[in-house]
Regions:
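Short acidic, Gly/Ser-rich segments with clustered Asp/Glu that frequently serve as metal-coordination loops
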Residues: 183-184, 204-208
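Glycine-rich phosphate-binding "P-loop"
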Residues: 140-156, 246-252
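Domain-core and long-helix interface of multi-subunit machines
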Residues: 152, 175-182
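Alpha/beta catalytic barrel-like cores
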Residues: 1-96, 103-119, 123-134, 138-139, ...
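Conserved short-loop catalytic and cofactor-binding motifs
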Residues: 146, 176, 275
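Short, glycine/acidic-enriched loop or turn micro-motifs at the edges of active sites
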Residues: 103, 180, 205
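Residue-level marker for buried hydrophobic side chains located in beta-strands
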Residues: 97, 174, 199-202
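Active-site segment flanking the S-adenosylmethionine/decSAM binding pocket
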Residues: 192-198, 204
């Protein structure tokens, strides 16, 4: 089992997502920004290793405009050695890496231009995993997409795009996540049957949208879509409901009681767990402590000290909802 957090480390004084406006694009600016992003990414990975956090989702913006037609510079060749060095470090420490392209990546859009741009973005992000020389257990995570008034037709378009338009290198890395509004675990299982794509399981989305499958059963159904040799163990996202907020809003910080209750649902299932929680690495460190206490992670080396996140703002208190005043009765 591995545990981690996505994209941004709020402890370190650097960003791996530096960018600039399209209007100010230049090769010089691109090179400077990518070099800075890669240097920060190395710092993040080293910090994660020091804390035993061996699952990390890299941000999509390492190379600004990486899939945009304006970017014609051969950045893959220019930064090949840098990516290879990152990959060597990742493999040395048995880390697992993923990307989660932005919501504009939609494979079942009825607009062919959106699908074309989505494929270009997947190719770009997959190429970074290839440059790091990571095997196919490093994944590209997307949602099933929209329904567009006809979910069956939308699923058919997704299937057609997968089989007939995606490069094999992208297919080997692609996983689909159950969401909280449109495509449940059951519908993602249907996509798996049509395409073989593994399902990245999101426990919180399953709580929001399901067909009555208990959590322990849902976990095993999703895990059964992953091939041990070329997919690895089940990747999953973990979060819980933010108190007194709209349904589906993620919690600001890890709630130990809910996390421990979820661990019971695993019942021995091996997973790599991404915490989609607002305070990022702070919750990941706390989650790792709970996993060690449960015997699910190895102990840290002698002398390890748990970091203190005292400079973090406290989670916002629940919003007080004041009822709207009633309109005066008609006289």
């Amino acid at each position: 089992m591995k545990i981690g957090y996505p994209c941004v480390n709020e402890t370190l004084p650097c960003s791996a997502a530096g960018t600039f406006r399209l209007a100010s694009y230049s090769e010089e600016r691109l090179l400077t920004t990518v070099a800075s992003n890669l240097a920060c990414l190395r710092q993040i990975l080293e910090w994660n290793v020091s804390q035993g956090l061996l699952f990390f989702r890299m941000g999509s913006g390492i190379v600004p405009f990486g899939s945009h037609e304006v970017n014609t510079f051969p950045w893959q060749e220019h930064f090949r050695a840098d990516f290879q060095a990152l990959g060597a470090y990742i493999k040395q420490h048995d880390m697992r890496i993923s990307f989660h392209p932005d919501q504009f990546v939609v494979l079942n859009s009825p607009d062919p231009s959106i699908v074309q741009r989505s494929i270009a973005e997947l190719v770009y992000q997959g190429s970074m995993l290839d440059l790091m020389e990571l095997d196919s257990t490093a994944k590209l995570q997307i949602h099933a997409g929209g329904a567009y008034g006809d979910k069956d037709a939308a699923l058919a378009r997704w299937t057609d795009t997968f089989h007939n338009h995606l490069p094999d290198a992208v297919k080997a890395r692609l996983v689909v996540e159950n969401d909280d509004r449109l495509y449940s675990l059951r519908e993602c299982l249907g996509l798996h049957e049509r395409t073989g794509v593994p399902i990245l399981f999101d426990n919180f989305h399953h709580e929001c949208l399901n067909h009555g499958e208990p959590m322990h059963e849902a976990l095993r159904l999703a895990a059964g879509t992953w091939h041990p040799s070329h997919d690895g163990v089940l990747m999953m996202d973990y979060s819980s409901q933010a108190p007194d907020e709209r349904k589906g809003k993620h919690t600001d910080t890890l709630v130990p009681e809910l996390f421990e209750s979820f661990l019971a649902d695993l019942n021995g299932l091996d997973v790599d767990m991404m915490l989609e929680i607002k305070d990022k690495e702070a919750s990941a460190v706390r989650g790792a402590q709970l996993l060690r206490a449960a015997g699910l992670l190895p102990p840290m080396p002698a002398g390890y000290e748990v970091p203190v996140f005292a400079d973090r703002p406290a989670p916002a208190p629940p919003k007080k909802r004041t009822p709207k005043p009633k309109a005066p009765a008609a006289s």
